[in-house]
Amino acid sequence: MRYLNRVVLYIIVMVLSVFIIGCDKSSDTSEKPKEDSKEAQIKKSFEKTLDMYPIKNLEDLYDKEGSRDGEFKKGDKGMWTIYTDFAKSNKQGGLSNEGMVLYLDRNTRTAKGHYFVKTFYEKDKFPDRKKYKVEMKNNKIILLDKVEDPKLKKRIENFKFFGQYANLKELKNYNNGDVSINENVPSYDAKFKMSNKDENVKQLRSRYNIPTDKAPVLKMHIDGNLKGSSVGYKKLEIDFSKGEKSDLSVIDSLNFQPAKVNEDDE
């Protein structure tokens, strides 16, 4: 009888030990949540700025602060840089792109930049580059340089950045992306297939000459820390290109950095 009691007691102790060890392991698991996939991390990094889209009034950026780091001097409120361009293959076998960059200084609450027209040739010829200074007041683009071409002048004065009409709050709807990483830079890229039914795609087709029914690819690129850095940058590209020798895309970026003395040096 005494032997049987010892056996029962031994079994109880063993069961309790297994139960306690199991609880400890489950506790460790709960304390160490599973790290997000690189695709999810790239999306989260972009969400910090894309959640602000559409920015219908660009002057709202004066009251919004981005991620700060040690590159910012004391008292510097920082500067937003917003950029959009449309690039396409040209008849000369090169590339033409046209767009605008605007620097919004939160310290002075002023916005200056330029509209650019660039033509790159396949070979044996230097590219053509033209810049036209602009500023923004009351959410309106004001052309500062003289432009002879009335069509170009109209395009500049009526220009809208992709971030002013895009809505990319539901990045989670883009799944199974093709992710590539270069740890040496570091840089991160993710590609997602888009649908022609996407409202962002419809907006681009209504604003630009896109002579293809091919559904585009959304490309997300990050240089620098995934959590954000004033040294690195992020950009989006909506690529309508038909093949390797065909370029047709819209590039967009919105980055927060320390304010510069002269934005035109960019």
From Swiss-Prot:
Matching InterPro entries: Csa, Csa_sf
UniProtKB keywords: Cell membrane, Lipoprotein, Membrane, Palmitate, Signal
Lipid-linked residues (S-diacylglycerol cysteine): C23
Membrane topology classification: Lipid-anchor
Keyword Lyase: no
Gene Ontology CC entries for this record: plasma membrane
Localization in the cell: Cell membrane
Signal peptide boundaries: 1-22
Lipidated residues (N-palmitoyl cysteine): C23
A Pfam family this chain is assigned to: DUF576
Family, as annotated: Belongs to the staphylococcal tandem lipoprotein family.
Alphabetical list of NCBIfam families matching this protein: SA_tandem_lipo (TIGR01742)
Protein name as it appears in the record: Uncharacterized lipoprotein SAR0443
Organism lineage string: Bacteria, Bacillati, Bacillota, Bacilli, Bacillales
